[in-house]
Amino acid sequence: MSQNGDQNVSETIGIVGGGLMGHGIAYLLAAAGHKIAVYEPSAELRITLPQRLEAIAALLDEDAALTKKISVHDALAPAMRGASFVFEAAPEKLPLKQQLFAEIEKLVAPETILASNSSAIPSTEIGRHLKHRERVLGTHFWNPPHLVPLVEVTQNEKTSAETVRRTMDLLRDAGKVPVHVRRDVPGFVGNRLQHAMKREAIALVASGVCDAETIDTVVREGFGARTAVLGPMEQTDLVGVDLTLDIAEVLYKDLDATPGPHPFLREKVKAGKLGMKTGEGMRKWTLEQAETVRRRLSQFLAGQAKARRKAATR
């Protein structure tokens, strides 16, 4: 049963990777009524996968019994058996992804769609050496994938229109909001937008304009307060393209244009200031503060996800 209450076709879907992204992708597709097989080479991740899936069900107030539709395997072949779709969520290393896709191609039917969840590596490169490149594309889920609705469906120069259509239909029926990215550029759409803002934020802090906490406050309590209901192109049309041009004439020449990562970012990494996991990054964090941020984000996104599912079944 799809998220909008309609009957949809149950697919057999293989998931490569049961870690940070893979387990959430497995859950949301199982919740949509599909049979899921996860390949995870790490024994530790295989052992913890059932508990992590049950935690998602508890967070969303859903029946944990649906996780029984998800099987876990320590070898690739059984997880690919009979799959009509394969979603790869392996570490962000091109040689690894290319090797996995080459092995997967030998195990599945020619019409099986092969999708990579890479957040930056173009699917053109991942599938470059495959025989059936027309069925390869990118499906960039946002973390956590079971809570954030967007999926960037990115075609490459060889991807067929049928591959895009089938993938968009599957994701839409699972309650996601897929968007079609027509060119396979690094970072796709979302990460390019996100990192354009992050580059300017880092430059502002590095140059002493403000501190990191001020950046976060300005985003959350300023334009971020409307971003969920008003995208940047809508906002441009709302205030006027002419006004946007006037502002751009004054502002754009002063925005940061550092080629490559800002030296300030490199200095943080060199000093071991890696963020919440080390107690300091752009800001300082206690264990309690870090946990509060994670819990606040999870509860907020879960509330939105439950509201969307409730609205879809009315």
Regions found by a protein language model. Give the residues of each.
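NAD(P)-dependent Rossmann-like dehydrogenase/reductase catalytic/cofactor-binding core
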Residues: S2-G5, A32-H34, D173, S207, ...
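NAD(P)+-binding Rossmann beta1-loop-alpha1 motif at the extreme N-terminus of oxidoreductases
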Residues: S2-L59
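Internal alpha-helical scaffold of NAD(P)-dependent oxidoreductase catalytic cores
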Residues: H34, V153-D184, H195-A225
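Hydrophobic/aromatic beta-strand patches that form the interior of the parallel beta-sheet core
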Residues: A37, H73, F87, L137-T139, ...
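Rossmann-like NAD(P)-binding element
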Residues: P41-E44, T48, A58-I113, I121
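Structural/interface elements that position substrates and couple domains in central-metabolism enzymes
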Residues: E54-A57, G190, Q194-E200
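Rossmann-fold dinucleotide-binding core
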Residues: I113-N191
